[in-house]
């Protein structure tokens, strides 16, 4: 996944959301316009109602990754194979079952948060 960098958030206010699968952080409008660079199989740029299903405004911390493949922090957070960009340290919500099924169909691993 992701050689090209993901969009960085254009604002760091309350409109930020994090992808529940890969934890990429962008604004609602950025997810609406271009989807999630790491999770194209969700097709959220085509189905705007899905943004609420696969992203959350409830997350802890942000880390920016310029070269995730070489970063020990990216490996520790399990985001080393994702596109360079801004990621949350943790999300507290699980991906809905329907979206987990989409991950299975796409043969993409989903690791739910440890504490919900």
Curated annotation (Swiss-Prot):
Job description of the protein: May regulate transcription elongation by RNA polymerase II. May enhance transcriptional pausing at sites proximal to the promoter, which may in turn facilitate the assembly of an elongation competent RNA polymerase II complex.
Q: Which family does it belong to?
A: Belongs to the SPT4 family.
| Cellular localization per UniProt | Nucleus
Q: What is its main location?
A: nucleus
Molecular function per GO: zinc ion binding
One GO cellular component assignment for this chain's record is:
nucleus
- Cysteines paired by S-S bonds: none
Q: Which UniProt keywords apply?
A: Activator, Metal-binding, Nucleus, Repressor, Transcription, Transcription regulation, Zinc, Zinc-finger
| The protein's name in its UniProt record | Transcription elongation factor SPT4 homolog 1
Q: Which GO terms describe its biological process?
A: regulation of DNA-templated transcription; transcription elongation-coupled chromatin remodeling
Zinc fingers, C4-type class? 19-39
